């Protein structure tokens, strides 16, 4: 080493990530003294650490599960973690309960919208302590569904529309309309046009039919609610007859 390499200590350059091997050659100038064998050491200069996070579920229902996992690149590997939460993404607080691991299990016992991030501390000399970007996890109330019909009684050939109203849930829904002749079991899935948010019941034959909607929320931890049933009646077309009491008079 040409610069600074003749003293009892040496400052290793750390501007770039590289592996160095160093040895010291000691010369004892006293007459008759042996020169000890060189000692070799390895110095590893690592790139500065960086951290990213990802959540298994960012939109879920109460009681579901979401785990946020951190991925650290570079650095020395001598790491410690501090997870933080924020209601608005700007004011942060340390998470004291289970908030010091490489991953974090989001609490889902109540509906909330919370931002999360992790601070990583690298214990090696000269290493930065990176902070991840944030991820928003929304815990929704369980979904519920109701249905209504614009014309509960029509004549053959008329028209009606059954509409659904959904509250809460993640919004990632699928629909299955069902029919029953009496409002009790068995309920039969409607295969023709029966998988939308609304349903137009057939009116070609007179009769009474009950309808309901089975809603599937595809979010993690979400229940699949079933609406109450409503009755739809198709009446025969009206007909009229007349009679006269005295068909012939003076």
Model-derived regions, located:
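A short beta-strand segment in extracellular, disulfide-stabilized domains
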Residues: 64-72, 158-167
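Short, solvent-exposed loop/turn segments at the edges of extracellular beta-sandwich modules
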Residues: 27-34, 121-128, 216-223
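Proline-enriched interdomain boundary motifs that mark the N-terminal boundary
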Residues: 47-55, 141-149, 236-244
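Conserved Ser/Thr-centered positions that define the repeating blades of beta-propeller domains
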Residues: 1, 23, 83-86, 117, ...
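Solvent-exposed loop segments of extracellular immunoglobulin-like
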Residues: 72-85, 166-179, 183
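Interdomain boundary/hinge segments at the C-termini of tandem beta-sandwich modules
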Residues: 41-47, 135-141, 230-236
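Short, solvent-exposed loop/linker segments at the N-terminal edge
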Residues: 58-64, 152-158, 247-250
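Surface-exposed, flexible coil segments in extracellular/virion-facing regions
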Residues: 1-14, 84-108, 178-203
């Amino acid at each position: 080493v040409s610069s600074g390499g003749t003293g009892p200590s040496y400052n290793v350059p750390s501007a770039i990530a590289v592996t160095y091997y160093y040895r010291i050659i000691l010369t004892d100038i006293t007459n008759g003294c042996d020169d000890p064998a060189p000692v070799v050491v390895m110095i590893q200069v690592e790139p500065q650490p960086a951290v990213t996070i990802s959540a298994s579920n960012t939109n879920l229902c109460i009681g579901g599960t979401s785990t946020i996992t951190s991925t650290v690149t570079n650095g020395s590997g001598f790491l410690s973690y501090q997870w933080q939460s924020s209601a608005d993404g700007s004011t942060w607080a340390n998470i004291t309960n289970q908030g010091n691991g490489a991953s974090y299990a989001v609490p889902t016992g109540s509906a909330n919208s919370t931002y999360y991030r992790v601070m990583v501390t690298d214990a090696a000399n000269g290493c930065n302590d990176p902070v991840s970007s944030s991820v928003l996890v929304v815990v929704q109330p369980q979904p519920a569904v109701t249905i209504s019909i614009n014309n509960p009684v029509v004549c053959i050939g008329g028209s009606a529309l059954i509409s659904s109203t959904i509250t809460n849930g993640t919004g990632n829904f699928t629909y299955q309309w069902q029919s029953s002749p009496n409002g009790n079991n068995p309920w039969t899935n409607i295969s023709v046009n029966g998988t939308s948010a609304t349903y137009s019941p057939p009116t070609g034959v007179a009769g009474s039919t009950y309808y309901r909607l089975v809603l599937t929320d595809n979010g993690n931890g979400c229940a699949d609610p079933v609406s109450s049933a409503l009755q739809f009646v198709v009446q025969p077309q009206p007909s009229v007859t007349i009679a006269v009491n005295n068909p012939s008079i003076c």
